[in-house]
């Protein structure tokens, strides 16, 4: 990324594990980085169709807006531990939770490290909330012992809660 940036922004946005990294930044710098990756032997380098340079310094105005918005929101302490992906550590203080959410807008998604943290701390099942199953697949590639379940509809919430009890 440093070689491709040449005065603009190019940085690792996601460490998805299994050698899969996502980079973000200015389009010319990311395109240059993709070419460099291929030239240096990367298995492949794909340009993702995204609407913004997520998880990069170019998102700072959005992070600032999020900080302002969260200043008007009451964040409560969680009932269960919440692992902040941007620091790969549990957070429970409401002010720290808000700060980490803001930090994540420009910060790297550390999915590989997060799944490794879960495994090291006795987490055996991961629930992916939303219509996709991408994170579940990535998690199983990182740790074959982890079980995953998807919550894609309201009815799935009841099934997941029953499994937890």
Regions found by a protein language model. Give the residues of each.
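Acyltransferase
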Residues: 1-149, 155-158, 164-165
């Amino acid at each position: 990324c440093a070689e491709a940036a040449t005065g603009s922004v190019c940085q690792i946005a996601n460490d998805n594990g299994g050698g899969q990294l996502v980079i973000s930044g200015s389009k010319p710098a990311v395109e240059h980085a993709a070419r460099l990756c291929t030239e240096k032997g990367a298995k492949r380098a794909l340009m993702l169709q995204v609407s913004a340079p997520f998880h990069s310094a170019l998102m700072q105005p959005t992070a600032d807006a999020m900080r302002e918005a969260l200043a008007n929101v009451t964040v409560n302490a969680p009932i269960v531990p919440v692992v902040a992906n941007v620091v790969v550590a549990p957070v429970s203080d409401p002010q720290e939770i808000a700060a980490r959410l803001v930090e994540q807008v420009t910060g790297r998604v550390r999915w590989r490290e997060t799944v490794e943290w879960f495994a090291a701390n006795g987490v055996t099942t991961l629930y992916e909330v939303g219509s996709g199953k991408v994170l579940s697949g990535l998690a199983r590639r990182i740790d074959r012992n982890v079980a995953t379940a998807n919550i894609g509809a309201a009815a799935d919430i009841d099934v997941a809660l029953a499994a937890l009890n």
